[in-house]
Amino acid sequence: MQSCARAWGLRLGRGVGGGRRLAGGSGPCWAPRSRDSSSGGGDSAAAGASRLLERLLPRHDDFARRHIGPGDKDQREMLQTLGLASIDELIEKTVPANIRLKRPLKMEDPVCENEILATLHAISSKNQIWRSYIGMGYYNCSVPQTILRNLLENSGWITQYTPYQPEVSQGRLESLLNYQTMVCDITGLDMANASLLDEGTAAAEALQLCYRHNKRRKFLVDPRCHPQTIAVVQTRAKYTGVLTELKLPCEMDFSGKDVSGVLFQYPDTEGKVEDFTELVERAHQSGSLACCATDLLALCILRPPGEFGVDIALGSSQRFGVPLGYGGPHAAFFAVRESLVRMMPGRMVGVTRDATGKEVYRLALQTREQHIRRDKATSNICTAQALLANMAAMFAIYHGSHGLEHIARRVHNATLILSEGLKRAGHQLQHDLFFDTLKIQCGCSVKEVLGRAAQRQINFRLFEDGTLGISLDETVNEKDLDDLLWIFGCESSAELVAESMGEECRGIPGSVFKRTSPFLTHQVFNSYHSETNIVRYMKKLENKDISLVHSMIPLGSCTMKLNSSSELAPITWKEFANIHPFVPLDQAQGYQQLFRELEKDLCELTGYDQVCFQPNSGAQGEYAGLATIRAYLNQKGEGHRTVCLIPKSAHGTNPASAHMAGMKIQPVEVDKYGNIDAVHLKAMVDKHKENLAAIMITYPSTNGVFEENISDVCDLIHQHGGQVYLDGANMNAQVGICRPGDFGSDVSHLNLHKTFCIPHGGGGPGMGPIGVKKHLAPFLPNHPVISLKRNEDACPVGTVSAAPWGSSSILPISWAYIKMMGGKGLKQATETAILNANYMAKRLETHYRILFRGARGYVGHEFILDTRPFKKSANIEAVDVAKRLQDYGFHAPTMSWPVAGTLMVEPTESEDKAELDRFCDAMISIRQEIADIEEGRIDPRVNPLKMSPHSLTCVTSSHWDRPYSREVAAFPLPFVKPENKFWPTIARIDDIYGDQHLVCTCPPMEVYESPFSEQKRASS
């Protein structure tokens, strides 16, 4: 290639000297220099040659062009519709001049997709994959390739949204119901939710449930719980006003009747299996609740906690087919007795019926959640871990109860063999009964043992008392056992030890702790054990759900943009997937480099000084950010400042998170233009100035406008001693145009699953890292196992997630998105998102009222359609429009939020003009259908809106008595064609029936379509 370049009279550089390479890249890099980069004193001929080379070899793989939907022609046409000459003019008329960024972003040049994957390979190679037997809630597992390929790597599964619209979400609702049934069966409890963020968070939610249940302010924790779980619980308790005490069961005193609940681990963090029946009975006698952190795989052979009276069982489902991922994402489970179900946190899938009487699925008891009850909600949970819960459910379905029991027995047998070999080698075991974890008092030098382990690249857990911990898993084979025995100086092989032990019943199967109750007896767990059948089952469920593979999902405040294949590819690489979160840092240098680079880029994009990646969702980021503010104020001696001002238009998570952080919420009015009411804000600040802690604002506002006085709002709060928390949910309208850290915000969470391309996964995973200004940096969260303190003066707020860096394995997605877009591409994405929204608003403004606009008549990246007048004119509500949109092949916009009776639309930058036009055409057609009702041309009760959605079963039925045609029902516009139509699979849901007849586990098999039973096949 050099000779070819010389033939053109050019000079082509290699490596750092003449080309551009991303940090961490290796090998020659042929990308041209940035035009803005300095030559460092090089000659002008070389610079000219470089520019000539760019013209001769132009880029043909510009990722921004792939990511941003509208091309140049589309953009010109949309600008013409708006009566604007350029996109710069649009931004000038939309974003206040005083906050606009006056310089280009200081970012590396964009990188092509092939190069980004090569660079990520180089970074990931710096992670060392040792065999980690550290345990503590994280285990190696065998991820079935059929689930990996057909679910985790499948855009039809990962690009769905939380199933608020059940008629187009029956597939993942069924899968999540399977997950809940799995959890209930294995734990022996009555009801389970559809996942929480991680085990530590689940334990903290248990603490809050106990407090809500009996209003007692003391919570007892067994110190043999996992240390990260204890830390998360203690941090939550600090701001909830609950006192936590670490006590062994024999030390726990319930006589004062002041204990809300007790938390213990079964088996505990040291591996011990013990009987907690007496503890549970003592707790119940005093009116306290018993909470058990446990292990689903262990419970496949171990007596379940529901059988000895536990009220709440929680833990991680990670070892059910989900990789370690350096800490996540993993789905936590949470199960309760039936009497506690209405206080349970998080989403819950229930069985109900549709308009035809068919049993179907929906999200149940939503009135207890943050988007409705706000600060009085059971939790602030919004995003959870739906995708990982679906993986765990499919793992259980694929293996069935017998397969899971087989895996559990295999793990337990391996641990028994290892324990026998260790005892023969002169080592002492701390506990006699265990499942998969041993705590070992070495009979020789611990340093010597660790040295031999390092030779084999094996990690153990080192306890503070000098003992070692080993936790085995389903991947352990005979060679692994031989290596472990050699490390501890055992002269026998695993085979010899096993032969000497014989096949007599040992361990849990020979004890009173043996599980005798059946589990996973429902036919769904006994029908899909071949790969053929599990693939067909996953595909059947996928086909019931609308996702980004079908059409745009215009949910306001949700930013359902493209999740590109190149961004997603690295998350399944073993170098990212198979790293335990507590390995020494020198084994995770690739991850550490990625964290540093992503933090640097996010700081540049936001104007903040430091970023913490620990929060696993936007709501958890809110809680972490507000807790950081409280820690800062406490350190200043201003702990009395607890008032948090929140506009009434705020996300429901805002007041719920402020309540979790121990703040007192004071609402602020919104004026008729959708802005914070400046007069009311000033009055509230004056009223609470002595106790003002913070204001929570969203920008652009949740009403879809850039408020002109945002800097004045921030200044007002600062002048009265408060801090500014800016909700990052709408960051997709700011990147490259303005930075919250520049116009007065002190802290924000960043929804990486919105602005920065992590897929929503049908309700999680997400990431909510928080960015802070430097005065808050010393108070960012820490971790008890891996310290995150950057200096000795730090005063961390505590721990908010179980893993030090949260859901680490999905961070490469956002890293890759930023690197491939570059500063210019990121700014273009923001501009296009704003252009798309304004174009749609313009097309729809003569048919629907656009509720709020900015000072110069434009919306931000989203807008609100007012459907309230139709209630009076045609008895049509927002829900009718939402359901009718399904017949046109679209998921509904955000419904009845932030204003009841309205629809909020956010198109994102990824949708091209043709798709925007299809959606607008659908909305205009629906408006005409409403007009037909208003003008008496169609029945006001039996019409396409009230009867929507129209399923395939309905349209093809031999019975059709509706006063409109099947064609109007199913194919209302020319672009809705039989060959490409997405069909709702059920009729309209009956929400009231579902909450009045609560069923949250799998219904009888009669309601399933085309059931297949391997058991029936075998018996025949």
Curated annotation (Swiss-Prot):
Tell me what the record says results from G768E. Answer: In NKH; loss of GCS P-protein glycine exchange activity; no effect on abundance
Single Gene Ontology BP term?
response to methylamine
**Cofactor(s) of this protein:** pyridoxal 5'-phosphate
Q: What is the effect of changing P581R?
A: In NKH; loss of glycine catabolic process; decreased abundance
Effect of mutating R373W: In NKH; decreased glycine catabolic process; decreased abundance
- Where in the cell? Mitochondrion
Name the catalysed reactions. Answer: N(6)-[(R)-lipoyl]-L-lysyl-[glycine-cleavage complex H protein] + glycine + H(+) = N(6)-[(R)-S(8)-aminomethyldihydrolipoyl]-L-lysyl-[glycine-cleavage complex H protein] + CO2
Q: Which SUPFAM superfamilies match?
A: PLP-dependent transferases
Transit peptide endpoints, chain numbering? 1-35
Domain of life (superkingdom): Eukaryota
Q: What is the effect of changing R362C?
A: In NKH; decreased glycine catabolic process; decreased abundance
Q: What Pfam families would the database entry show?
A: Beta_elim_lyase (PF01212), GcvP2_C (PF21478), GDC-P (PF02347)
Name listed for the protein in its UniProt record: Glycine dehydrogenase (decarboxylating), mitochondrial
Organism listed in the record:
Homo sapiens (Human)
The gene that this protein is the product of is GLDC
